[in-house]
Amino acid sequence: MAVQLLENWLLKEQEKIQTKYRELNRISVIEPSIIFIGDSIIEYYPLQELLGTSKTIVNRGIRGYQTGLLLKNLDAHLYGDAVDQIVLLIGTNDIGKDVPMSQALTNLESVIQSISRDYPLSQIKLVSILPVHQGEEYKQTVYIRTNEKIKAWNQAYQELASAYMQVEYVSAFEELLDQEG
């Protein structure tokens, strides 16, 4: 019961954010150079402040997002006529919700194909799924996500990216891994 209530709350929150993004896309007078799309890792990351670039960066992350939701609501995340790069970081919630890898890859490939069709001059950066801390104190947080599982997904992401000239796979997994995971 409590889990279902939390799931329903999260879906309503995601819908609010999608609506906000669609409205911002409609009224924005700023043309983005780079659009970051993904889950809470993107949503809560202060991109403009920490990347220190003069390019216009737009953050379109949504907490709890999965590849299926992204595919269904891709229009809420994309706008502009001269986008240089679109950065995708998504998948950890698919793993956490036990979405089959094949389904997530199908969703992600459809996202890539849609972006490629609508933004043929934009470079797509597919960022690897980030590692999780596998210490005892984080078991409830990471749930069924393990670094071994994430490695397998990242290998599949890399293979998917290599099938598209417009897509570059960006490995962040190894760079963020330490002895604790």
Description of each model-found segment:
Residues T56, P100-S102, Q140-T146:
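Short glycine-enriched, charge-decorated loop/helix-capping segments at active-site entrances
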Residues M1-F36, I42, P46-T53, A163-Y164:
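N-terminal secretory targeting modules
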Residues E43-L51, L69-T106, S114, I129-E137:
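Oxyanion-hole/transition-state-stabilizing segment in secreted/luminal serine hydrolases
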Residues G135-S171:
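Substrate-gating cap/lid alpha-helix
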Residues Y119-Q123:
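A short helix->loop->beta-strand "cap" motif at the edges of active sites that frequently abuts
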Residues T56-G68:
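A short beta-strand-loop structural module common to alpha/beta enzyme folds
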Residues I37-G38, V127:
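Short hydrophobic segments within beta-strands
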